[in-house]
């Protein structure tokens, strides 16, 4: 497998001498980064000595709202907390579409002309629809949820790649509008949710290095 699908820096932050990572270390030291990543994935899939108290993988549940969020995301209607395109008499929300029918691509800047609240720009980079999709996958085992997640997350990473040298000015001021996708609560919420997302998705055949 090609090494170029794996970021080598991944291994710089992992203790390769940790018990259970012997295969990972062996592949890494041989320059086989893809196989090292695959061995790392197998380690996470099979380990039993770590429990995430936030989730229940044996009897997973999902709320009606989270199921709606997961399903709307399949159509590129992404849940952005506090914002929606419309709401009906039963308080069922329809979320904004981020799909550009002209380019047939995701438009991450969509609706900024109508939703001028700065919070809208921040919240959409917190990916609040991804955890509901992970829950929906764990319950249904329907690969469409992880395929949607992979497509969307890959597109976001391609659109907003992290660049070394991101500046973190004091709170407040227009300088916070620079690189805000990689600042503060945007990053914190993504990281916290990804811990749970990984556990829900990890046994999917589509979850690969």
Model feature map: region roles:
Residues 96, 105, 112-209:
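Aromatic-lined, polymer-binding surfaces characteristic
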């Amino acid at each position: 497998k090609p090494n170029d699908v794996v970021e080598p820096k991944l291994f710089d932050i992992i203790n390769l001498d940790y018990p259970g990572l012997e295969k990972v270390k062996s592949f890494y030291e041989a320059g086989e980064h893809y196989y090292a990543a695959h061995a790392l994935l197998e380690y996470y899939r099979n380990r039993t000595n770590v429990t995430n108290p936030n989730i229940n993988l044996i009897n997973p549940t999902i709320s009606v709202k989270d199921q709606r969020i997961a399903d709307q995301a399949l159509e590129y209607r992404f849940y952005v907390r506090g914002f929606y395109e419309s709401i009906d008499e039963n308080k069922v929300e329809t979320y904004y579409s981020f799909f550009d029918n002209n380019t047939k691509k995701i438009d991450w800047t969509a609706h900024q002309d109508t939703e001028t609240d700065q919070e809208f720009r921040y919240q959409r980079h917190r990916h609040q629809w991804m955890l509901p999709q992970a829950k929906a996958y764990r319950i249904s085992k329907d690969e469409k949820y992880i395929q949607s997640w992979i497509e969307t997350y890959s597109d976001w990473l391609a659109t907003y790649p992290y660049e070394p040298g991101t500046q973190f000015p004091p709170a407040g001021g227009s300088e916070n509008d620079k690189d805000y996708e990689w600042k503060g609560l945007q990053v914190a919420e993504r990281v916290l949710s990804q811990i749970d997302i990984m556990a829900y998705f990890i046994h999917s055949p589509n979850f690969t290095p």
